[in-house]
Amino acid sequence: MYEKILIRYGELTLKGKNRDSFIAQLARNIKLITGEYPETKYDRMFLTYSDANLEKLQYVFGITSYSPVIFCENNLEKITNSAIKLVNKDDKTFKISARRNNKKFELTSAEINQKVGASVLKHYPLIKVDVHNPECNINIEVRSDKTYLFSKTYEALGGLPVGISGSTLHLMSGGIDSPVAAFKLMKRGLKVSFLSFISPPQTDEKTIGKIKDLVSVLSKYQGKSHLYLANYSKLMNYISFTSNESYRINLMRRSFYRIASKFAKGKNIMTLSNGENLGQVASQTIESLSTIASASDLLILRPLIANDKVETINIAKQIKTYDISIEKAKETCELFAPKNPVTKPNLATALRLEEELTQLKDLEEELLANEIEHYTIE
């Protein structure tokens, strides 16, 4: 019965001169995820109808909603026959919502509502009109060349098309927060690449598999993803010799940021991102965040900075990362955590401790040159 899927985009129409580039990016993303370029018409997009496409469109950012549609000629009889097809025999109430964009059509929107509604009542004698809360709302749009009709609307993700806002290198862990942060960054139009620090043999194949599984789930929302695994074992062992054990996590995370910044620049990525949340752990106090962030000269995006944990968990369940995130696995930060981590670190102290670790920068350069593996995940 259905011929096409009508795709609506919201924020994109508000972007003025950039509108064409937004629409083009959205079309490319739809092609990437469904395998088919949509047709753009009437400030809408149209994609071939299939159950597979209906399912895949729920993963495309930039779409506000979509509906399976029937096309017909601008002829009242054809419109009426198409409308009758959209009524389910079990529907008890209905409404006709007509919109006449083609002012040359002989009937007004109100007249279309009346005449098509009368025909539906005649065809289904037991059905009743309910203009407030109908079980079946038949939408009719009369355009210049044809009319399209639909009764079902699927809510979509909204946001902006992935890639329109640039790209970010996301410091990825296997916890609950990090994948949710990546999802939110994609929703604001960023293409996300992933960098994860591992420390074999302490972090085993199960840990690596968990991270790959999380990136695989997230790839449904942006298409092909790049995952980089950095072997941090030598550096972790070296930093453990710091003269102030309470600064161990701060020194490690500062090292993460130095490495990530250089690596990102090499990939022409100008922002870093993570799943940090204010005050959640010792390394996420204002003082810790400030001390750690000063190791990078790139913008650091923290989309979860003010989230409640419950909010983050709810999103994780929605996007199907939660069950993977709660699987038991050894994380580099957990393995390295001191008994009493400093909660209000001082930058001057961190810099002094780094100076004592005379081989630190050389080991970071060695990691960048030899210890990063690349995976493409779809």
From Swiss-Prot:
Pfam families linked: ThiI, ThiI_fer, THUMP
Subcellular location(s) per record: Cytoplasm
Keywords carried by this UniProt record: ATP-binding, Cytoplasm, Nucleotide-binding, RNA-binding, Thiamine biosynthesis, Transferase, tRNA-binding
Keyword ATP-binding: yes
Protein EC: 2.8.1.4
GO molecular function, one term: tRNA binding
UniProt feature coiled coil, ranges: none
InterPro entries: Rossmann-like_a/b/a_fold, ThiI_AANH, ThiI_fer, ThiI_N, THUMP_dom, THUMP_ThiI, tRNA_STrfase, tRNA_sulfurtransferase_ThiI
Primary localization: cytoplasm
Positions that bind ATP: 171-172, 196-197, 253, 275, 284
GO cellular component, one term: cytosol
Associated pathway: Cofactor biosynthesis; thiamine diphosphate biosynthesis
Domain THUMP: 51-153
Keyword Translocase: no
Top class in the EC scheme: transferase
Catalytically driven reaction(s): [ThiI sulfur-carrier protein]-S-sulfanyl-L-cysteine + a uridine in tRNA + 2 reduced [2Fe-2S]-[ferredoxin] + ATP + H(+) = [ThiI sulfur-carrier protein]-L-cysteine + a 4-thiouridine in tRNA + 2 oxidized [2Fe-2S]-[ferredoxin] + AMP + diphosphate; [ThiS sulfur-carrier protein]-C-terminal Gly-Gly-AMP + S-sulfanyl-L-cysteinyl-[cysteine desulfurase] + AH2 = [ThiS sulfur-carrier protein]-C-terminal-Gly-aminoethanethioate + L-cysteinyl-[cysteine desulfurase] + A + AMP + 2 H(+)
Annotated family: Belongs to the ThiI family.
Function (record text): Catalyzes the ATP-dependent transfer of a sulfur to tRNA to produce 4-thiouridine in position 8 of tRNAs, which functions as a near-UV photosensor. Also catalyzes the transfer of sulfur to the sulfur carrier protein ThiS, forming ThiS-thiocarboxylate. This is a step in the synthesis of thiazole, in the thiamine biosynthesis pathway. The sulfur is donated as persulfide by IscS.
Protein name in UniProt: Probable tRNA sulfurtransferase
The organism of origin for this protein: Mycoplasmopsis agalactiae (strain NCTC 10123 / CIP 59.7 / PG2) (Mycoplasma agalactiae)
Species classification: Bacteria, Bacillati, Mycoplasmatota, Mycoplasmoidales, Metamycoplasmataceae
